[in-house]
Amino acid sequence: LSPSESCVYVAKDGALSSALVEQTGGISVDENELKQYLETAVIHFNEEKGAGALAQNQKNAERLPAALKSVKAGKDTVTAIFDYASFEDLKAFGETNDNEDTSNSLTALEAKPLSEAIADGWFSEGELVKADGSEAGTDTVQNEKSGMAVRSEGGATLMVGGKVLYRSSNTELKDDSTVSLPETGTAYVIFKR
């Protein structure tokens, strides 16, 4: 994950991350100080959620509600990437006083294998288009065996862990794996995993 703008990321296995990308306007930012500040914010959040006083996920351990994956301070840009145990954790962490990420207004986000999303009745006739915006028939979508489906409500830039195959007509394709989600209504993105 190397985003050029703030986004929410859904991996091929459905795991959730977010990236906070901010322009510094040429102001120098100390990477170590930023990392320390963000680690403290993550630890505080995790403690409030009843998890350990940790800032990073540990191997072979349960995922923390929030984890700081990486921090990078460049000449003009700072980037922080966070991992989450659930969408509820992503949303709650975004609402803390320690988090300056206002890049998304998501109120719901769920990811699951396409076969499960179809079985659960996520899609109705005419809701989906191919990545390029052309019409996608329901049969075409149902024949896609290896896809991952994302359903969301609220605005955001959504980056996914594979090539976008289908999307709601109310979304905008930004590149092969990035979609702009609308502020209102339910949006769907199906990507190859």
Regions found by a protein language model. Give the residues of each.
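Mature, soluble, non-transmembrane domains
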Residues: 61-193
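N-terminal Sec/ER secretory leader and immediately downstream segment
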Residues: 1-66
